């Protein structure tokens, strides 16, 4: 006679400090990424993030060259000027990427031929968490929705992830219907 025991791993509920909008937004954003990559089996596209890291590495290298260049100060002015100028250019490129390309997008993901972007906004002192799911190739196909964060956190600050994932499921089904109509 054999006995089979199943062990279930229960995740510790996520606690946040109520009225800390940054922590609340980060918790909700992380949950969206978890839902899209786990439940919907999308693969997260990190190309833009890797590009930003590469530019940051180049900027740090320029700063190190400017600091540790072997020739003393008065003679190394052209090198310092070049390093500072290139650092400014790299900073402007990173700023451009953040403001005009990445915008409020927290996730870019793909599955077979389907590519999506998810943007979120939680304004300070506003209880409504806004999510926009859109097709990465055709931004006119999008599903925006806004819900109060009170639905996803109890009075002690415990994150009610299943409630949030249920709402996400409904929105992603709407998005899938719109996406199929367009194809």
Swiss-Prot record:
Side of membrane Lumenal, spans: 74-80
Biological process per Gene Ontology, one example term: signal peptide processing
InterPro entries from the UniProt entry: Spc2/SPCS2
A single GO cellular-component term on record: signal peptidase complex
Pfam families assigned to the protein according to its UniProt record, in alphabetical order: SPC25
Principal place of residence: endoplasmic reticulum
Keywords from the named record: Endoplasmic reticulum, Membrane, Transmembrane, Transmembrane helix
Family statement drawn from the similarity comment of this UniProt entry: Belongs to the SPCS2 family.
Main function: Component of the signal peptidase complex (SPC) which catalyzes the cleavage of N-terminal signal sequences from nascent proteins as they are translocated into the lumen of the endoplasmic reticulum. Enhances the enzymatic activity of SPC and facilitates the interactions between different components of the translocation site.
Protein's recorded name: Signal peptidase complex subunit 2
Biological source species: Dictyostelium discoideum (Social amoeba)
